[in-house]
From Swiss-Prot:
<dbReference type="GO" id="GO:0006821">
    <property type="term" value="P:chloride transport"/>
</dbReference>
<keyword id="KW-0564">Palmitate</keyword>
<feature type="modified residue" description="Phosphoserine">
    <location>
        <position position="290"/>
    </location>
</feature>
<dbReference type="GO" id="GO:0017081">
    <property type="term" value="F:chloride channel regulator activity"/>
</dbReference>
<feature type="topological domain" description="Extracellular">
    <location>
        <begin position="27"/>
        <end position="32"/>
    </location>
</feature>
<dbReference type="InterPro" id="IPR029181">
    <property type="entry name" value="Barttin"/>
</dbReference>
<feature type="region of interest" description="Disordered">
    <location>
        <begin position="127"/>
        <end position="149"/>
    </location>
</feature>
<dbReference type="GO" id="GO:0032991">
    <property type="term" value="C:protein-containing complex"/>
</dbReference>
<feature type="region of interest" description="Disordered">
    <location>
        <begin position="162"/>
        <end position="308"/>
    </location>
</feature>
<feature type="compositionally biased region" description="Polar residues">
    <location>
        <begin position="172"/>
        <end position="183"/>
    </location>
</feature>
<protein>
    <recommendedName>
        <fullName>Barttin</fullName>
    </recommendedName>
</protein>
<keyword id="KW-1133">Transmembrane helix</keyword>
<feature type="compositionally biased region" description="Basic and acidic residues">
    <location>
        <begin position="162"/>
        <end position="171"/>
    </location>
</feature>
<keyword id="KW-1003">Cell membrane</keyword>
<dbReference type="Pfam" id="PF15462">
    <property type="entry name" value="Barttin"/>
</dbReference>
<feature type="topological domain" description="Cytoplasmic">
    <location>
        <begin position="1"/>
        <end position="5"/>
    </location>
</feature>
<dbReference type="GO" id="GO:0007605">
    <property type="term" value="P:sensory perception of sound"/>
</dbReference>
Length: 308
């Protein structure tokens, strides 16, 4: 590399010398000589400059990747590496690998025995839930050991919502469950209830005997419960049975209410006698003149105005 660099520099310097020599000869009126020196000098200078410019760029060489790696390893290591790579590439013949893949595919579980059975609402799924063990022997050729497979059968019960017709039939067939007396039914209003008109009306509290009569009637005697059995409509009209029970309860409660009504009449008479006295006291304006008056008229010092 150093020799090439010095040669390029000498080539350029020689071209410059030929140019200067041609200029000197041109001053002595010899055109046939200095033209030759000018042409040779210019060619040498241009060639040297282009050569130097091409050497500045890096050279592109294709070097294999294994060459550097092979230079670092010894020949024994290279031979061992080649044998190991050959073993890894083909550990078994191709037909052996295909046979192993086929055996693995056969060892996978088979899901073809799964069956689906749609059961009705009234059917009992308990017999299907009992697990059963079954053994199956795979067909094998002569001289090969028989492989036995065991699997367990289990049933999966999926509960789906019944249609309205099926639900009504099942409710009519099955007896309605008795509701607990501790939990009270929820109350709900009608959608078309007029709130403004209900506020203007005077509140009419329901008698306590009506609630007692409702509690005495068992829930089972009211017929099969509907889908919204836990809700009680406030504006619902009473049933004929409830009306009969309410009438009986009111007839039984009449003799017990008679002494209470007499007592209320006596209290109203006493209150009416006290009301006139309170009205007379309210009409009086000023301090009352009574023997217990702390400020009598004599001590007040009032004197009548005498008009003279």
């Amino acid at each position: 590399m150093a020799d090439e660099k010095t040669f390029r520099i000498g080539f350029i310097v020689l071209g410059l010398f030929l140019l200067s020599l041609g200029t000197f000869l041109m001053s002595h009126d010899r055109p046939q000589v200095y033209g030759t020196f000018y042409a040779m000098g210019s060619i040498m200078v241009i060639g040297g400059v282009l050569w130097s410019m091409c050497q500045c760029y890096p050279k592109i060489t294709f070097v294999p990747a294994d060459s550097d790696f092979q230079g670092m390893l010894s020949p024994k290591a290279l031979s061992l590496l080649e044998t190991g790579l050959s073993e890894v590439k083909s550990p078994q013949p191709p037909y052996v690998r295909l046979w192993e893949e086929a055996a693995y595919d056969q060892s996978l579980p088979d899901f073809t025995h799964i069956q689906m059975k749609v059961m009705g609402y009234s059917e009992d799924p308990r017999p299907l839930l009992a697990p059963e063990l079954k053994t199956g022997t795979s067909s094998a050729k002569e001289g090969e050991p028989h492989s036995a497979q065991t699997w367990m059968e289990a049933a999966v019960v999926v509960h789906r919502e019944l249609d309205e017709k099926e639900g009504e039939k099942s409710r009519s067939q099955s007896s309605p469950p008795a509701c607990s007396q501790g939990s009270a039914p929820l109350a709900s209003f009608h959608d078309d209830l007029d709130v403004g008109s209900s506020e203007g009306r005077s509140p009419q509290p329901s008698p306590p005997d009506r609630d007692e009569a409702h509690l005495q009637v068992p829930w089972a005697s009211r017929g099969p419960l509907d889908r919204f059995g836990d809700f009680a409509l406030i504006d619902d009209t009473p049933i004929s049975e409830d009306m009969g029970l309410e009438g009986q309860a009111q007839e039984e409660a009449l003799p017990s209410k008679q002494p209470w009504s007499l007592r209320m009449k006596e209290e109203t008479v006493q209150a009416g006698a006290e009301e006139p006295e309170q009205e007379e006291e309210d009409l009086y304006y000023g301090l009352p003149d009574s023997p217990g008056d702390p400020l009598p008229d004599k001590e007040l010092g009032f004197e009548p105005d005498v008009q003279g």
